[in-house]
Amino acid sequence: MSTSPAKFQGIAILDHKDWKNPKKVEYEPKKFLDHDIDIKIECCGVCGSDIHTASGHWGDITKPLVVGHEIIGTVVRLGDKCTSGLKLGDRVGVGAQAFSCLECGRCKSDNEPYCTKSVWTYSTNYEDGYNSKGGYADYIRLHEHFAIPIPENIPSHLAAPLMCGGITAFSPLLRNGCGRGKKVGIMGIGGIGHMALIFAKAMGAEVYAISRTSAKKDDSIKMGADHFIATKEEPDWATKYFDTFDLIVVCSNSLTDINFDVVPRTMKVGGKIVSICAPEQNEVINLKPFGLLGVSISNSALGGINEIKQMLDLVSKKDLKIWVETVPISEKGVKEVFERMDMGDVRYRFTLTDYDKEFFT
């Protein structure tokens, strides 16, 4: 039985040239399919991807653009062939992915984000041409596989940023052996970086927070960092930390400021440098030959559904608390977070809240 409306409402970008002035709109949701669910949204985290997409940094947009892929809400409709075990009224989270084929080798090996038929939660076309709409809205409709139950002891406003930013931080740590006895560097202590720091510490690693200046040193220590490196204030830092790291996760907004002539020298033989960076569309980096150092440089995108469940289990069992500021959703509220995100004025994530007041009164 459906308890969702025929049309959804959202706070949308109508022109990327005027992206900081979003407007409330009404729109048709995608066609409801047998394995789809509808979710009434409670809150939604604000991700850097929202800014890149809204501003046109990643290319032109299909309008109206409703961003948001760190969604927490309640299941209000289930398709006739749903088999995931979700029930009406369940609190679930949705991240950056709304669909994949679930049949290819990548999907069957828990690598859904790497499926060639992936549809992202917003600004991606389904096979029928419908352009997906995200979580700055009253409801969202998507395949049941990509809605994940949230443990009871994780508050919704803290759970939301985990669904994209959190798993983006957690996946490279999990896949690259973060744990006891390992020395792990987190480069870039922003929204994702601060979560990577908290996770790495909870996983048992010796954690080094790496930032350009010491401005975030106190915060990093409070988050659990064992060491702090300010690269601009310690010109010889790579020499000092030669042969130190098993893993460095690069969480910066851009790779152009990362000196790849220097960073590999800090790695142990067999060490891994993994970037989660998704910079502007026109960014290019040049890598010089970095010698016979036995170091790997790679990238990571999101994480599979099972990895998200493992992350939520870690957060729940360890009672981890990420640093979040809440802002009520509205045209004014979204404008505020866009402006502050663009200026870097956030410590360390935003969650849009008060959906009932904006959409359901």
Regions picked out by a protein language model, each given a short descriptive name:
Residues 2-6, 261-262, 305-361:
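C-terminal hydrophobic helical "lid"/dimerization subdomain
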Residues 28-44, 57-108, 149-154:
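Glycine-rich beta-strand-centered segment in the early N-terminal region that forms part
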Residues 93, 248-249, 274:
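N-terminal Rossmann-like NAD(P) cofactor-binding module of classical short-chain dehydrogenase/reductase
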Residues 100-187:
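NAD(P)H dinucleotide-binding glycine-rich loop of Rossmann-like/cofactor-binding domains
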Residues 180-189, 201-261:
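Adenosine-nucleotide cofactor-binding segment
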Residues 193-194:
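N-terminal Rossmann-fold NAD(P) dinucleotide-binding loop
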Residues 266-269:
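Helix-to-beta-strand junctions that scaffold the AdoMet/dcAdoMet cofactor pocket
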Residues 272-274, 285-326:
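Rossmann-fold dehydrogenase core element
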